[in-house]
Amino acid sequence: TSSLFPHPRL
């Protein structure tokens, strides 16, 4: 899955 913003994937 691609995100529009770099978020911490826990």
Swiss-Prot record:
Modified-residue entries (Leucine amide), positions: 10
Domain of life (superkingdom): Eukaryota
UniProt entry keywords in alphabetical sequence: Amidation
Tissues with expression: Found in the abdominal ganglia and perisympathetic organs. Not detected in the thoracic ganglia, subesophageal ganglion, corpora cardiaca, corpora allata, hypocerebral ganglion or frontal ganglion.
The protein's name: Myotropin-2
Native source species: Schistocerca gregaria (Desert locust)
High-level lineage: Eukaryota, Metazoa, Ecdysozoa, Arthropoda, Hexapoda
